[in-house]
């Protein structure tokens, strides 16, 4: 992507916690199908989706490039994010707020009379305000209840789950969702706790149980990530979200997804590869190689600029993957298509 501004302005919200929107200009340009954003960028008609509104940084910039007749559906599970989204919707009639997971995107849009959209963007994982607010339980640097739910109005907090989960299952969660090599040892230490009420106490137990950790990285990082991903079914939701993009995106519609760790990025990469290569592996028992329809084209990965990483250190691990929906109607029949 060329001629994209190298840093993002600080987004504003009524929250006391600041939030730097990652890959702001790159993401909005990608979801519009533009190489860059400038004064000559045309206003776009159509229907767009911000699948993870957060504090609205991407949505607010996108609205500057949408026509008066365009629509922007914004999704989020977090009630605090929805409060910010409702404030934006009160000011801009183009914004429609949906308090739900992007895993239910198709159902939510269909119920509002929308069957296809022109662009979908998502910024995966936990946001800076969520991390910075100790009461949410995401942070191992600030004390609070061990909650970690994206949607605090439903579901089970991590602290309650830890009271009943067995040691083996906990170890599997730490390994599978946090890629924690010392998962067995850490799980044993966690299950030795008498209560699960403080994130700082939990982080300290993990630290004491961790025999070796990477310099500059808190030893509880991967364990907290694992428990958060598990309790919110984040990977399952991502898989559902990506699958729905096949049917929701109109021909030449744009998909733009930001991820922050390998478990997320690997899923997005494999999904786009699978649906953009257009051919099954060769089978010697078939008379000719079978063809799979190509549902996406031009997949690419974009990293934050050095300037952005300097301004916002949390962007250092971010990757933006973008792709264009082809004109091929989605075929739900998995059988090969012969050319």
UniProtKB/Swiss-Prot annotation:
Pfam family, one: Methyltransf_5
Binding site for S-adenosyl-L-methionine: 56-58, 76, 102, 123, 130
GO biological process: rRNA base methylation
GO cellular component: cytoplasm
Gene: rsmH
One Gene Ontology MF term: rRNA (cytosine-N4-)-methyltransferase activity
Full protein name: Ribosomal RNA small subunit methyltransferase H
Family: Belongs to the methyltransferase superfamily. RsmH family.
